[in-house]
Design a protein with these regions (language model features):
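A generic "binding-loop/recognition-motif" signal
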Residues: 51, 70, 86-87, 95-96, ...
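Short acidic-glycine-tyrosine-enriched beta hairpin
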Residues: 69-84
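Catalytic-core "active-site belt" of small-molecule-metabolizing enzymes
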Residues: 2-8, 15
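Double-stranded beta-helix
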Residues: 30, 95-115
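Short, conserved beta-strand element in jelly-roll/cupin
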Residues: 36-37, 49-65
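Short beta-strand His + acidic residue motifs that chelate non-heme Fe in jelly-roll/DSBH
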Residues: 65-66, 82, 88-93
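A short glycine-rich, His/Asp/Glu-containing loop-to-beta-strand
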Residues: 11-45
Length: 115
């Protein structure tokens, strides 16, 4: 067991100046904190998919979630689930959005971007 206080054990990922992503993981479970400070977005991010299951908690802000051909309006405190291989994307609707994401299995592609 390990206790992480104030995100000291998180790895920071290189993204861009307007997106801050931190990650911590076990063998089969990954937890990320992602902060968008470039909103509101004019257009949604390009759709993407991955073999990982994802559950995300909207910790701050407001966004639109697009999953396949469906659109959802999400506010602080809402949660969304994305099954494996479904096309999905988001569009931030406020200046700042913070998401807490869980992935299983872990996103090896994220670890390759950490420093």
């Amino acid at each position: 067991m390990e206790v992480v206080k104030h995100e000291e054990g998180f790895e920071k990922l290189e993204t861009n100046p307007n997106i801050n992503r931190k990650v911590i993981h076990l063998k089969d479970l990954m937890f990320t904190v992602i902060e968008f400070s470039n909103g509101p977005m004019e257009m949604p991010d390009p759709p993407h998919n991955h073999p990982h299951e994802q559950i995300s908690y909207v910790a701050a802000g407001k966004l639109k979630l697009f999953v396949e051909d469906r659109e959802y309006l999400l506010n602080e405190g809402d949660v969304f689930k994305v099954e494996s291989n479904l096309n999905h994307s988001i569009q931030t609707l406020t200046e700042f959005v913070k998401l807490i994401d869980g992935f299983s299995p872990i996103r090896e592609d994220f670890l390759k971007r950490s420093h």
